[in-house]
A protein has these predicted regions:
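C-terminal structural segments of small proteins and small subunits
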Residues: 59-78
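Short, surface-exposed connector motifs at secondary-structure boundaries
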Residues: 18, 43-45
């Protein structure tokens, strides 16, 4: 299983890339929701790290995934 970070901040994404985590930078709610759906369908990602702003933009979708799926584990970072 892979780990990925969905970030709204380029600096956060770069820092996590240096630690070996794949990252994407997205700032649009619809794109984030679509990306989360893709992650669930592909079933390759075990952990999704999201920044605070991403969580706030897509709180309902993230909580739905947390409540209805064992994977991926979604972790918020500041």
């Amino acid at each position: 299983m892979e780990v990925i970070c969905i970030s709204d901040n380029l600096e956060t994404a770069i820092g996590l890339r240096f630690s070996g985590i794949n990252t994407v930078v997205i700032n649009n709610r619809e794109e984030i929701n679509n990306y989360l759906e893709t992650i669930i369908k592909e079933n390759k990602i075990g952990i999704v790290v999201v920044t605070k702003k991403i969580y706030e933009l897509c709180k309902e979708k993230i909580e739905q995934i947390r409540n209805n799926s064992k994977l991926p584990l979604i972790v918020n970072i500041p």
